[in-house]
Curated annotation (Swiss-Prot):
Source organism of the structure: Shigella flexneri
Keyword terms, alphabetized: ATP-binding, Carbohydrate metabolism, Kinase, Metal-binding, Nucleotide-binding, Transferase, Zinc
Gene Ontology molecular function: any one: N-acetylglucosamine kinase activity
Protein name, per record: N-acetyl-D-glucosamine kinase
InterPro entries: ATPase_NBD, N-acetyl-D-glucosamine_kinase, ROK, ROK_cs
Name of the encoding gene: nagK
Amino acid sequence: MYYGFDIGGTKIALGVFDSGRQLQWEKRVPTPRDSYDAFLDAVCELVAEADQRFGCKGSVGIGIPGMPETEDGKLYAANVPAASGKPLRADLSARLDRDVRLDNDANCFALSEAWDDEFTQYPLVMGLILGTGVGGGLVFNGKPITGKSYITGEFGHMRLPVDALTMMGLDFPLRRCGCGQHGCIENYLSGRGFAWLYQHYYHQPLQAPEIIALYDQGDEQARAHVERYLDLLAVSLGNILTIVDPDLVVIGGGLSNFPAITTQLADRLPCHLLPVARVPRIERARHGDAGGMRGAAFLHLTD
């Protein structure tokens, strides 16, 4: 059996998958915020419960935000303070007496989608998350591409391209990002960015679901806003797709529930790509909240 953990700031979610990659059991517990020992105990107790339930010693994979394992062997994850700065993989491997594999949660999302039965035909899969932030991951021939610092796929911290400033106006504000830079596309293309753009142009503080509801009702202002957002998304993706050239782009995160994102994006891409480039297939993520657990479990299927 394959155990996949999706660990965030508020919850530790475990999914148990069989050899057919089907979910057999799942359980969630709160994430301890202050004690590393309590954090380790929470993970180990879930593993012990799964081992007993299924009568086996399952493999363990973990998806977690941040940098799962740097050169010093430690995890760096601001959202998981109890474990940040600790040698999480080594400590869990020792306590559980098995090989524990860690990866960035966005990479696990991409891996989950790349291993979907419908998508395994595609050699190079790009996962794109449009949620609270903007992130993603790359999977080539069924294996995640992590990079030296586990930041492959941090698309949200690419800067706005010149064409975006031409489109939006040269006085368009380059917002300061949490990473310390200015003009990162995450500040405009995330769910929060979607709402910020609306307020910037129309001076109304609406949240993304409210704007989308107006769009669905035919509101002209909301429709103009969505057109602008999709144009900005397309021009920003142009640079990424030119570098990566994926066969498939799978979009997850809260904004992926808005059908216009996946149905209208492809037609806007050709003018931002090389003339010889082929627009990749663009699909909404298939596995929703289970994606992180799936991808983490499948880290042991990539050998």
